[in-house]
Amino acid sequence: MKKNRLLWLCAVLMMVVGMGSCSSDDVNNDLWGTWSVVGYGNDQDFHTGDNIVNTTRLTFHQGGTFDGYIWPNEVNGTYDRKGDLFSFTRIMSTQLGGQDPDRRLIENHIRETKSYKILSGSELRLYYDAENYVKFVKVN
């Protein structure tokens, strides 16, 4: 009887230790992959067009890093997320210039990101305030 209790206790301890090693970033891998911008704004006033679509692409990696481009500049850095809260903790960018006003706005909005939402696994919204967001679609 004591042997069974000891085995049971060991099994429970192993499960608890195993669960503690899973980080939320390992479980929430829905963000990982490449995303392309299709517009920005909110549900009532959404901006899109040829000067926006496919001009920004970000690839999020496991471990809180990302890379990509906000045309014509390459970007990379780190991000942090807890629940639906999201922030870019470091953004490095080349400074090639040539951005039109919409692309500058998108870059500023991305830098101001406070939360995120993934809809249907293929739409990413990076919210820069309570209702306005930059909308991405999953590329891969």
Where are these regions (language model features)?
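Sec-dependent bacterial lipoprotein signal peptides
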Residues: 1-20
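Lipid interaction determinants
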Residues: 8, 20-140
